[in-house]
Amino acid sequence: MLSCTTSTMPGMICKNSDLEFDSLKPCFYPEDDDIYFGGRNSTPPGEDIWKKFELLPTPRLSPGRALAEDSLEPANWATEMLLPEADLWSNPAEEEDIFGLKGLSGSSSNPVVLQDCMWSGFSSREKPETVVSEKLPGGCGSLAVGAGTLVPGAAAATSAGHARSGTAGVGRRKAAWLTELSHLDSECVDSAVIFPANKRESMPVATIPASAGAAISLGDHQGLSSSLEDFLSNSGYVEEGGEEIYVVMLGETQFSKTVTKLPTAAHSENAALTPECAQSGELILKRSDLIQEQHNYAAPPLPYAEDARPLKKPRSQDPLGPLKCVLRPKAPRLRSRSNSDLEDIERRRNHNRMERQRRDIMRSSFLNLRDLVPELVHNEKAAKVVILKKATEYIHTLQTDESKLLVEREKLYERKQQLLEKIKQSAVC
């Protein structure tokens, strides 16, 4: 829970923990039982969701970080409580890059970049008032962005002054910042400024005047350093000697870029600036290829130049030689396969020829057998089974007739022998 310094009583710092609930009581629903039944002091949860989450603007650079950079003194308890969670745990530039709030400074007249959407300490029945347009003290450097130009902040100019001021200046800045923050509690910001996702408009592009050169506050460029380094790594190449410079701004769904031609006089002025300004000027992208957004698949594709497309290398005919060598070992295999096929075809052809010869011989034998059977001599349409059956019966009859003839032959032979003996006896007598 946030500290009681963000309550409806500006300028008051509560050190008693029992008074925190009293100061933050307007943030909660009434304690009546009829909260959802139209009580006297109740508000339906769906009446206006933006009234439940009223917004309080916070500076782009947190007070704890700004004071820690200037002095070696540890921040007090009030500064630690007022420090947003985004500054405590992560880089605010990365958080702005995730929620798409980095391009918010170019679309609104508010110089304060809003970070914490849930920092609210006043009643839900109060209407949001106008956007805070007044700047914070010089200790917190900010980048005031107009409709078309970038105004350099005070962080780069006052960095040397902070080193010379000492602890007395730090105490004055703390008190001034807390006083200014207490006066900002009574005002809130419209939700359309915080969540521009519903607006599908391209963000205005900020340009750098030639007279100003690259004199942009270092604190503002630190938020863009991470994304610019990613773009430099993703881009193809960077030319060192060109005069055309790409200034890239992170918008809602795509990157808007402008080409600003800086004369040689601007380069001479940049050479005379402080090392901090020179370091911030180096962060500006020089002449490079078109930058494509990597993970935004919903964004329309960027137009590509025909020269940027990689040309396909023509296929050379040199690899054909090794391919022929690779195909050569397959030739014997094809020959063996063709030989085996020819052998199979020849074998089948011989088998068919022998089968036809066997069938012809069998047919001729059946026809001859049919002619030998007396009953089937004139029957040309006799079946093979009938021919075989009748031939078998005829053979049996022939065998019986043969046996009878053999018996008769034996009888005749015996008769012959008897007659020869009678002739011999008659001759002796």
From Swiss-Prot:
Keyword terms of this UniProt record:
Apoptosis, DNA-binding, Nucleus, Phosphoprotein
Lineage summary: Eukaryota, Metazoa, Chordata, Craniata, Vertebrata
Q: How does it assemble?
A: Efficient DNA binding requires dimerization with another bHLH protein.
Highest taxon, organism lineage: Eukaryota
Query: Where this protein primarily resides, as one coarse class?
Result: nucleus
- The annotated region (Disordered) lies at 301-325
User: Which molecular function GO terms apply here?
Assistant: DNA-binding transcription factor activity, RNA polymerase II-specific; protein dimerization activity; RNA polymerase II cis-regulatory region sequence-specific DNA binding
The UniProt entry's GO biological process terms, in alphabetical order, are: apoptotic process; regulation of transcription by RNA polymerase II
Per the record, residues carrying Phosphotyrosine are Y36
Q: Per the record's keyword annotation, is Nucleus included, yes or no? A: yes
Name of the featured protein: Protein S-Myc
Which gene holds the coding sequence for this protein? Mycs
Q: Which GO terms describe its cellular component?
A: nucleus
Q: Which PANTHER family match?
A: MYC PROTO-ONCOGENE (PTHR45851)
Function, as annotated, reads:
Has apoptosis-inducing activity.
Region Leucine-zipper, as annotated, extends over: 398-419
Q: Does the keyword Cytoplasm apply?
A: no
- Gene3D superfamilies of this UniProt entry? Helix-loop-helix DNA-binding domain (4.10.280.10)
Concerning InterPro entries, the annotation shows:
bHLH_dom, HLH_DNA-bd_sf, Myc_transcription_factors, Tscrpt_reg_Myc, Tscrpt_reg_Myc_N
Coiled-coil residues:
none
Write out the annotated subcellular location: Nucleus
According to its UniProt entry, this protein's organism is Rattus norvegicus (Rat)
Stretches assigned to the bHLH domain? 346-398
